[in-house]
């Protein structure tokens, strides 16, 4: 179990806020199994705002089209250090550090034809520009018929491993079911040299619908979430749990994305408390 920045902070969490919540969790909740701090979506967007997404946002990317922490929100990431300083501080509290990531490759990298690390391919050659997320314009999907697509995920996960990331939450991947994306992440995790937990999350217009997930999900190497944030609609979430039982097994189970208490800065109720459990 752990804490996820989406609840309370939405898209605009800062390093100071992450550390404050991590310190509280280490002091009061770690003895009860709360051991993972996850920085959710838009950590790579300098201009992220509470309350929604910015279409066509300019992102913080490295020369290979991989997301970097926005230094105005995560000052310790300056000078190319990425999330390693923050991860080190989280680890120093006895906790694990996790990141949210959207499937695919940034549209900005495609626009600028940035190279894919270790290959002769460029982002515009490996992108599937017909594959888009319905609610976030940051990324295109990847064309997994091109070897550079797997190479991009491999390089992304190597970078995360070098920062000391322990957990990834891959979003917009189960609704619809992107089997190739899940398999590509699995290979990238195996090749990264890191020790990971992972979660593949539903993202679609009807998050409360029961999912029928195929057996290959067992190779995801972690958890599959049934839907979006639970809020106060627990009974509406139960069908998703039952649907996922056939795909559970050793090292792979069913969980919730978030179980929220209080309000959220991404909505009208203001910032209170939240949790990923």
Task: Specify the residue positions occupied by each region the protein language model found.
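Glycan-recognition surfaces
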Residues: 121-131, 144-145, 151, 191-277
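Alpha-helix-loop-beta-strand connector modules within alpha/beta enzyme cores
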Residues: 86-90, 183-200
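Active-site-adjacent beta->alpha loops and helix N-cap segments on the catalytic face
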Residues: 80-83, 176-188
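Intrinsically disordered, low-complexity acidic segments that are enriched in bulky aromatics
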Residues: 100-103, 108-110, 186, 195-197, ...
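Aromatic-lined carbohydrate-binding/catalytic grooves of carbohydrate-active enzymes
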Residues: 25-161, 165-172
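Extracellular/periplasmic catalytic domains that process cell-envelope and extracellular macromolecules
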Residues: 30-32, 90-92, 161-162, 190-193, ...
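An acidic-aromatic substrate-binding cleft motif
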Residues: 1-11
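Active-site beta-loop-alpha junctions enriched in small/polar residues
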Residues: 6-8, 42-44, 102-106, 173-175, ...
């Amino acid at each position: 179990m752990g804490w996820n920045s989406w609840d309370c902070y939405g898209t605009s969490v800062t390093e100071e806020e992450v550390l404050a919540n991590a310190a509280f969790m280490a002091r009061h909740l770690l003895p009860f199994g709360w051991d993972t701090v996850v920085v959710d979506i838009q950590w790579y967007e300098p201009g992220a705002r509470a309350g929604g997404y910015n279409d066509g946002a300019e992102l913080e990317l490295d020369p290979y089209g991989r997301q970097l922490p926005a230094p105005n929100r995560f000052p310790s990431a300056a000078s190319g250090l990425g999330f390693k300083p923050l991860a080190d501080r989280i680890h120093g509290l006895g906790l694990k550090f996790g990141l949210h990531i959207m499937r695919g490759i940034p549209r900005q990298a495609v626009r600028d034809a940035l190279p894919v690390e270790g290959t002769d391919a460029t982002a515009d050659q490996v992108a599937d520009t017909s594959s888009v997320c319905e609610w976030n314009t940051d990324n295109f999907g990847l064309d997994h018929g091109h070897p550079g697509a797997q190479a991009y995920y491999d390089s992304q996960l190597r970078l995360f491993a070098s920062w000391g990331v322990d957990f990834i939450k891959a979003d917009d991947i189960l609704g619809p079911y992107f089997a190739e994306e899940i398999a590509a992440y699995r290979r990238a995790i195996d090749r990264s040299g890191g020790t990971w937990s992972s979660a593949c999350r539903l993202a679609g217009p009807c998050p409360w619908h029961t999912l029928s997930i195929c057996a290959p999900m067992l190779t995801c190497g972690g958890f599959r979430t049934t839907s979006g944030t639970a809020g106060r609609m627990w009974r509406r979430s139960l069908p998703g749990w039952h649907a996922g039982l056939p795909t559970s097994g050793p090292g792979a189970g069913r969980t919730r994305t978030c179980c929220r208490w209080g309000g959220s800065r991404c909505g009208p109720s203001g910032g209170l408390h939240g949790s990923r459990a």
